[in-house]
Regions:
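Cap/lid segment of the alpha/beta-hydrolase catalytic domain
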Residues: 1-29
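Alpha-helix capping and helix-loop boundary segments enriched in small/acidic/polar residues
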Residues: 18, 22-25, 50, 97-104, ...
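Structured alpha-helical segments in the cores of large, soluble enzyme domains
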Residues: 27-36, 109-115
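Non-catalytic cap/lid and distal C-terminal segments of serine-dependent acyl enzymes
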Residues: 30-36, 65-67, 74, 167-184
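Primarily recognizes the serine-hydrolase "nucleophile elbow" in alpha/beta-hydrolase
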Residues: 32-94
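Flexible loop/turn segments at secondary-structure boundaries
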Residues: 56-59, 79-83, 129-133, 165-170
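The feature captures the conserved acid-bearing segment of alpha/beta-hydrolase catalytic domains
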Residues: 80-153
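C-terminal catalytic histidine-bearing segment of alpha/beta-hydrolase fold enzymes
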Residues: 144-184
Length: 184
């Protein structure tokens, strides 16, 4: 409908949106297809997923829709829309796609990623992240998600705050948290 365009950022993906296609597929489908391939060709007992920033957002979404991901870890990945007044937290096209979030908002996704047999969803935020989702705003929803997950009698949700550095990264401290959660 627009002719040829050169996509140079996530925000321009909205130009590809049609009634029958969503670019959200570019984020989700490769992971689902990979898990399908692994299940067909190997005999793994479980799947875990870790992502930072846009990868943390992808981790949240994919874990919410595919229960085969038993443990998922989103580092500096997302806040609910009501906590995104700071422009650095608003995110790219995929993080505020209204059609997607009419189906399930962020709080719904956090619960969906958490519940189920042997399922766990962990968010890690960097206290002094220069990019996005730094600080303690998660405290606005953390207890509500924990309480909601408990009503399902199976599943686990937790948030960690990493104050050991001032970068937009998965620090050694966060890696230790992830490792400890996986083996616990």
């Amino acid at each position: 409908q627009f002719g040829k365009i050169k996509i140079q950022s996530h925000n321009q993906l909205e130009l590809l949106e049609t009634e029958t296609f969503t670019p959200i597929k570019f984020f989700v489908e490769p992971i689902i297809l990979t898990i399908n391939y692994l299940e067909k060709n190997y005999d793994f007992n479980s799947y875990h997923m870790v992502g930072i920033s846009g990868g943390g957002w992808t981790t949240t979404l994919v874990a919410a829709i595919d229960e085969r991901i038993s443990q998922s870890f989103s580092v500096a990945g997302s806040y609910p829309m009501f906590l995104r007044s700071d422009t650095k937290n608003f995110g790219d096209y995929e993080q505020h796609n209204l059609e997607l979030y009419k189906i399930a908002n962020y709080l719904d996704l956090y619960v969906l990623a958490s519940v189920g047999d042997d399922r766990k969803f962990i968010q890690i935020f960097n206290m002094h992240d220069p990019c996005c989702f730094g600080g303690t705003a998660f405290e606005e929803y953390e207890d509500n998600i924990i309480a909601t997950v408990k009503t399902f009698d199976n599943g686990y949700f937790k948030v960690y705050l990493d104050d050991t550095h001032r970068e937009h990264e998965i620090s050694d401290h966060s890696l230790e948290i992830i490792n400890n959660e996986i083996i616990s």
